[in-house]
Amino acid sequence: MSDVQTLEYKGKVVQFAPENPREAEIPADELHEHLQNPSTERTRRLKARCRWKHAAAGEFCEKGVTAGIERMRLLTESHWATRGEPEPIRRAHGLKNILDKSTLVLQTDEFIVGYHAEDPNMFPLYPELSYMAVQDYLKSKYSPQPAKEAQEIVDYWKPFSLQARCEPYFDPVDLHRGYQVSTIEGPVFATGYNSVIPPYETVLEDGLQARIALAEEKIEHARAEMEKFPWHAPSGLEWIDKIDNWKAMVIACKAVIAWARRHARLCKIVAEHFETDPKRKAELLEIADICQRMPAEPARGLKDAMQSKWFTFLICHAIERYASGFAQKEDSLLWPYYKASVIDKTFQPMEHKDAVELIEMERLKVSEHGAGKSRAYREIFPGSNDLFILTLGGTNGDGSDACNDMTDAILEATKRIRTTEPSIVFRYSKKNRAKTLRWVFECIRDGLGYPSIKHNELGVQQMLEMAKYSRNGNGATPEEAHYWVNVLCMAPGLAGRRKAQKTRSEGGSAIFPAKLLEITLNNGYDWSYADMQMGPETGYAKDFATFDQLWEAFRKQYQYAIALAIRCKDVSRTMECRFLQMPFVSALDDGCMELGMDANALSEQPNGWHNPITSIVAGNSLVAIKKLIYDEKKYTMAQLMDALQANWEGYEEMRRDFKNAPKWGNDDDDADVLISRFYEEILGGEMMKNINYSGGPVKPTGQAVGLYMEVGSRTGPTPDGRFGGEAADDGGISPYSGTDKKGPTAVLRSVSKVQKNQKANLLNQRLSVPIMRSKHGFDIWHAYMDTWHDLNIDHVQFNVVSTEEMKAAQREPEKHQDLIVRVSGFSARFVDIPTYGQNTIIARNEQNFNAQDLEFLNVEL
């Protein structure tokens, strides 16, 4: 590594030599290629042969990846055969047909088994969701084969698709605007994108046989109620839909048990007739025993729990319906089974290192999991497979530290195996034990870009606040409010046996303030990308005599866009309730089971989040306009519009003035006061006037993922000095790349000024590699985190990777396959990201800590 960095602090010279002296021998531009350390040779082999499904610029990074046809074929077969039956039962039979007839996949070395397509290089498609998304695959090199059959399937499903069912409820003009993905993210019914928090707890604690018994008891009770004298139609007829839902739950659960037992038979056949290695043969027989029992029965040990959870994940996220995510409180969920196997050794006894290996194997299964996302989502998650994100840490229902040895096993496995997925959210509380915090730090220090950190206590408060709007008065209790996870990158939601989020149309999707500001300046017209009217006619900027007129024009554009975006989600939710029932997910939820309702329809805990992305470009632009045009009157709005139309060409001095105007992230009230007002009054205030399907206000949770690149490329030049087509700000409240010039604690102070209705925004920070890898690294990071917590900031995530190493990877990508970076809400292998995206990460300031920063953090070195 490079020469040792030093700093004078509190009267002494502090040296930041590597904590591990051997790192001094490693060239700085190849550090991360030396950090992988799988716990066993098996996981080393599994990683070497992993069939990654990462995509960038809409294309898959690895050769041989393609869409499979089995799921869509078998779903279509069932849909045709069940004409005339109630929709929930049709959906259950569709799942059953897939599980009964689909090809099973069993791979060498794996212990956790199960895949969701007919080949490990394949992924399924979902013609029942978006006809546009599937049609795009059919026109690509990833088309399922036979192509003629695939086209016939898509044609069959088009009138039945979620997209086709939703479109008639919108003005075609509004739809066309939404499909541009410039002012708002494409409607959920057009993208097919989804997310869910499966109630894993009921599967592991009860087993599916118990869920079947519950549903059958409910059916018997309902029939008895319907037969009572005197007949009362208003209440009696309500049982009909409930009975259909319970019947569908039974069909779905029985199908999943049978599918798991098909895996058991396959493992037994391979062991008894084909496997020659005695050790692997015994292992296959053990897997067969587990699959015979799981998920039919309650889990008893850690191997049981891991396999049962994996089967549940596949059904909920890939087979019954597509859903992004890997949402779960994994350490709390698995702790009883870790305790049984590792500590008490009462069932499936093992050592801690064996638990670490199991987690490494799960991480590789997730890395291999393919998702048939639309092209738009393959573009906006550059370098990603899908947004697989789990949650750790935080506090228990009684407020005590929730960290345990399972938490540490997950973090250790993560550090060792070095995969981009699943990403991890850590709920930071000052109650968390130091041992676990050290593991969190080491993962961050080693450049994984995660765990990202969420404020534990703020999350609990958010769950309790959302609970106030519960439609049936059964929102989160104070104890349940502690059991929250991130649904995807940023939005928190309850996990557990009941009240978890079941569909993306509850919370998610995005709105783009930078583009909205651009069209606000042009009477609602998008001149730089779509070349069409994108919003209401609110006037031309050159005619705005005051800044308040501009502010109010933006408010109207924002109101139009956010109302359209939320309406898209709620219309989609309504059609999901009618035609896209999820009988398996419903069977796992105690509320759905009790009430006989489908998971899409039941909403006990509102979770209405929506993502403003590119907010800082818009905010910085408003600051510059106010200062240079309305306050100082150095320029006129007409001059600014001419400069923007010219992409600043010929207006270089003027651009310098706008670029040098006060910027967010420097603890400068000349920027921070107006931008804080922008966040609280417009982005949050106007959004919260909208009430979603669940009865609660929609709240902002800015999380850029890769949309800051995609939308940046569709946004013309902006008054903050940005050129047209350049990437926007990379978080939800992160400073624009390279403009945070006053150090890491100035960023914290700026962000902390936004308090009202704005506590769910992504903050990206890039920290000094020498400082983080020194013996002082943990102490500085820990003090930073405690300060962040005290400032009541919701989120932060870190890149700890040098510019030198990233540029080396650009020159010789084949030598840097293990270099991982945080993009925004997810991590990716640097070499899988397009150059445009790579350069946005290089452009982020690498924050050093000076003496003033350390004093503000009150750190002792």
Swiss-Prot record:
Molecular function in Gene Ontology: benzylsuccinate synthase activity
* Residues found modified as Glycine radical: G825
Q: Where is this region: Disordered?
A: 718-744
Entry GO CC: cytosol
- Look at the named UniProt entry and state the broad enzyme category this protein falls under: lyase
Comment on pH dependence: Optimum pH is 8.0.
EC number(s) from the headed UniProt entry:
4.1.99.11
Q: Where is the PFL domain?
A: 40-712
Q: Which GO terms describe its biological process?
A: toluene catabolic process
Indicate the segments forming the Glycine radical domain, all copies: 731-850
Pathway assignment reads: Xenobiotic degradation; toluene degradation
| Family that this chain belongs to | Belongs to the glycyl radical enzyme (GRE) family. BSS subfamily.
Q: Indicate the quaternary assembly.
A: Heterohexamer composed of 2 alpha subunits, 2 beta subunits and 2 gamma subunits.
The entry's function note states:
Catalyzes the addition of fumarate to the methyl group of toluene, leading to the formation of benzylsuccinate.
* Protein name per Swiss-Prot or TrEMBL: Benzylsuccinate synthase alpha subunit
What is the originating organism of this protein? Thauera aromatica
